[in-house]
Amino acid sequence: YLNNFRYLYIRHDREACTCHANSCIMSAYFSNSHVQYENYINDCKPQCILNELHSWVECESGECCEQCRSECDIAESCTNGQPLHNFGYCYNGNCPIMYHQCYLYCYNSLGNQFPCVPYYTPR
């Protein structure tokens, strides 16, 4: 729960305040984080915060936004190393699936056992 402050771009007032220093989190919020949060909402207009959830939209781990695309769309439910239907693994809230990356950057090597390797190896 406390990590959500970081995902909402709310900065701590002091460098010493981290998610592990529980006593710092609320003091940072009350001093100026609410202004940063308001700026974030107004400037970035994050869909998952502003959009109303539909009752029929559901992710593997619960409700998500209208345009939910994958398991990693909800960063706090994505644990590093979590398998993604045998296509890849969650990493820092993202779903780096090698097949999709190789399709974009070196589509001619998709049939190889190690996609992208021939494309990036010195010849």
Swiss-Prot record:
Protein's GO biological process: proteolysis
EC number: 3.4.24.-
Superkingdom, natural source: Eukaryota
First-listed, main subcellular location of the protein, grouped into a coarse class: secreted
SUPFAM superfamilies: Metalloproteases ('zincins'), catalytic domain
Necessary cofactors: Zn(2+)
Alphabetically ordered keywords of this record: Calcium, Disulfide bond, Hemorrhagic toxin, Hemostasis impairing toxin, Hydrolase, Metal-binding, Metalloprotease, Platelet aggregation inhibiting toxin, Protease, Secreted, Toxin, Zinc
Chain ranges for the short sequence motif D/ECD-tripeptide as given in the UniProt record: 71-73
A GO term for molecular function: toxin activity
Subunit structure, interactors included: Monomer.
Record's function text: Snake venom metalloproteinase that has high hemorrhagic activity and degrades the alpha-chain of fibrinogen (FGA), leaving the beta- and the gamma-chain intact. It may also inhibit platelet aggregation. Cleaves insulin B chain at '25-Phe-|-Val-26', '26-Val-|-Asn-27', '29-His-|-Leu-30', '30-Leu-|-Cys-31', '33-Ser-|-His-34', '35-Leu-|-Val-36', '40-Tyr-|-Leu-41', '41-Leu-|-Val-42', '42-Val-|-Cys-43', '43-Cys-|-Gly-44', '44-Gly-|-Glu-45', '46-Arg-|-Gly-47', '47-Gly-|-Phe-48', '49-Phe-|-Tyr-50' and '52-Pro-|-Lys-53' bonds.
Family: Belongs to the venom metalloproteinase (M12B) family. P-III subfamily. P-IIIa sub-subfamily.
Name of the protein in question: Zinc metalloproteinase-disintegrin-like jerdohagin
The organism of origin for this protein: Protobothrops jerdonii (Jerdon's pitviper)
